[in-house]
Amino acid sequence: MKSVWIFILFAALAGCGSSKKATQRNSGKKSLARILKSHDYEYKRRMAEQFFVTKKYIKAQQVYEDIFPYYKTDRAAFEDIYYKYAYCAYNMGDYMNAENLFKSFMETFPSSKKSEEMDYMRAYSFYKQSPKPELDQTQTIKAIGTMQVFINTHPGSSRIPDANKIIDECRAKLEVKDFKSALLYYDMGQFRAAGVAFTSLLNSFPESQKADEYKLMVIKSYFKYAGLSIEEKQVERYEQVIAECNEFSDQFPESKLIGEAQEYLKLSTNNIKKLSNEQIKTTP
């Protein structure tokens, strides 16, 4: 009997707790509704500020939207409201809308002291939309472009080191994507396409720490392509491999991979000799 009473007591307490939470939620909704219905715009602005400071960004956003028309003639107040409104979107993770709002802020308040910050945050919003390397990198490319514009526009900014780091990070992501695409061609046996893709990768990222690896993959790709070609084309394609090997030696004389490149040079040279000898034998 005692256990039954304990169960009833806990059930009652749980019910009270749920009821209290529901009441608080309804109260919050009613409170926001009352604020929006008010004709006291200074009060509305204070409440929006309170929501913003306490990180209730959805509510702050709604109130800011409501008071925009009233404060448009008060330049200083309107700038402050627009600034915080843009950050509401950013802080809610709505980076696409935030980027547009940061850009719009700069266009609306071109002489604002916050323009530099907004310019950076616009570029940073593109960066926040940048996906993993396997996916479409449109936003990554936009992040690089807008960060570079920021650096050029604000050469004395304290944010430039961070901007450069972001550009480097985004370029590294593009490099990974291009490498995986080139490697996929190679793994699928599409060796000519792989050679072209690895060459493009090397041209796009000549300062990469893996540049010698990419060049070796160019050599490997064209070597395999030559081996699979019809006999009439093999000499010319092995000659291309030799040219790539010589470029490797010129560009990466200290590379630990130079031995492999020289081995492909030797193999290609020998293959050309064999092909030439066979042609001599078959010539009447």
Q: What is each PLM-predicted segment?
A:
Residues M1-C16:
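Sec-dependent bacterial lipoprotein signal peptides
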Residues C16-P284:
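Acidic, polar-rich low-complexity tracts and alpha-helical solenoid repeat scaffolds
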